[in-house]
């Protein structure tokens, strides 16, 4: 557990989640949990707040805690003047661009076989980078917020997961689930197209995405799965007939706003996060088979594609999807940034590589780090 008085260090034995509508930041650790069920039980036994992150693979250790101190403020985070970041340089790609294309090509061949049950797999890659000086996670989060003011920006200490001093930082556009009282809201994203600096080309890309049979099918996998998961726990569930467009500075997304009313008011935000994670948007369809395919084919994703959030004693809380993120090493010099994309039978491997590159720019841009090539 880290402590200190320099900028931001005081909370990095805890948690920061800065959303457009509010900020939760904590310090100190009263109890740590490496398993989500234990944290959920602690809430029912009187814990006032649980914060942290769930790993991509639910079988891997989580990084959750009941903090000693917490502050929840309304409105956007407005950090003090940010110090400059040290220079960050990309060292290597895991896998290489050519290897990622080969992986996607193999997946497309597998998915094209209608005799097998797999319908979608999210393929990810990562970049390893090195910083000339130590990166402060909260300063990194502040720079990400400055670049992506509409994003959900986070910094989470991964010590409870057996990663002493390592931190997950990111700026995600996607809320996994929010629960306030009996009301549940979420806005899953699936289907992506890179932005273009020319407004006319950019608008055309958005129109092509909205009308894309491939991307709408990929999005439908996610929505149908969420409807099936939430149906048993919601007395009412409102799902629009089709997706809408949202954008970040790097990409266009297909998004569907979903709203529900819980059957049991004892179902907490953490319960819902555990129920929904990982969605087909970060894993695939069917989920269990896609998860095994990813575990066999890729390097360990750690907390990329996981979930970051909080849940209070009333059961209220918000959890975001841990995309557009990176893990920082304990000494602050090492960075591993991630990007992925959903693969279906109609996917084009080169286009999928371009999509991961566009997503990686979200995080690396916040570090003022350029992608090679």
Label the model's feature ranges:
Residues 9-26, 30, 125-217, 232-238, ...:
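An anion-binding catalytic pocket shared by soluble metabolic enzymes
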Residues 21, 68-105, 118, 125-132, ...:
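Contiguous alpha-helical scaffold segments within structured protein domains
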Residues 52, 116, 177, 224, ...:
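A residue-level signal for conserved active-site and pocket-lining positions in enzyme catalytic cores
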Residues 61-78, 316-329:
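Structural signature of FAD isoalloxazine-binding scaffolds in flavoprotein oxidoreductases
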Residues 257-373:
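Conserved hydrophobic core element of enzyme catalytic domains
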Residues 52, 153-156, 302-309:
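A short glycine-rich, hydrophobically flanked beta-strand micro-motif that places a catalytic Asp/Glu
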Residues 1-62:
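A generic N-terminal leader/anchor concept
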Residues 119-124, 154-159, 287, 305:
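Short coil/turn segments at secondary-structure boundaries
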């Amino acid at each position: 557990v880290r402590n200190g008085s320099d900028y931001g260090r005081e909370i990095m034995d805890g948690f920061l989640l800065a959303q457009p509508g509010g900020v939760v930041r904590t310090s100190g650790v009263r109890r740590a949990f490496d398993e989500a069920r234990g944290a959920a039980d602690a809430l029912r036994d009187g814990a006032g707040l649980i914060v942290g992150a769930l790993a991509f693979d639910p079988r891997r250790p989580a990084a959750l805690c009941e903090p000693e101190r917490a502050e929840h403020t309304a409105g956007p985070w407005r950090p003090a003047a940010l110090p400059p970041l040290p220079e960050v340089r990309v060292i290597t790609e895991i896998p290489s661009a050519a290897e990622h294309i080969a992986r996607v090509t193999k997946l497309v061949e597998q998915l094209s076989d209608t005799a097998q049950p797999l319908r979608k797999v999210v393929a990810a890659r990562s970049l390893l980078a090195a910083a000339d000086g130590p990166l402060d996670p909260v300063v990194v989060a502040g720079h990400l917020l400055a670049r992506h003011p509409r994003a959900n920006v986070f910094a989470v200490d991964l010590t409870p997961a057996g990663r002493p001093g390592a931190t997950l930082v990111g700026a995600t556009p996607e809320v996994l689930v929010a629960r306030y009282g009996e009301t549940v809201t979420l806005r899953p994203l699936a289907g992506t197209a890179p932005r273009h600096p020319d407004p006319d080309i950019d608008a055309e890309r958005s129109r092509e995405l909205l009308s894309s049979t491939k991307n709408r099918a990929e999005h439908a996998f996610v929505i149908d799965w969420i409807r099936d998961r939430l149906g048993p726990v919601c007395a009412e569930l409102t799902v629009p007939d089709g997706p809408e467009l949202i954008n970040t500075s790097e990409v266009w997304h297909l998004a569907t706003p979903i709203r529900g009313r819980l059957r049991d008011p004892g179902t907490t935000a953490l319960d819902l996060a555990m129920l929904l994670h990982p969605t087909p948007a970060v894993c695939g369809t069917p989920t269990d088979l896609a998860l095994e395919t990813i575990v066999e084919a890729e390097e360990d994703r750690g907390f990329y594609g996981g979930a970051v959030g909080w849940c209070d004693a009333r059961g209220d809380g918000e959890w975001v999807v841990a995309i557009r993120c990176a893990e920082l090493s304990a000494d602050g010099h090492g960075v591993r940034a991630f990007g992925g994309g959903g693969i279906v039978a109609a996917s084009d491997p080169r286009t999928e590589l371009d999509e991961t590159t566009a997503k990686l720019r979200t995080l690396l841009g916040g570090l003022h780090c350029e992608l090679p090539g």
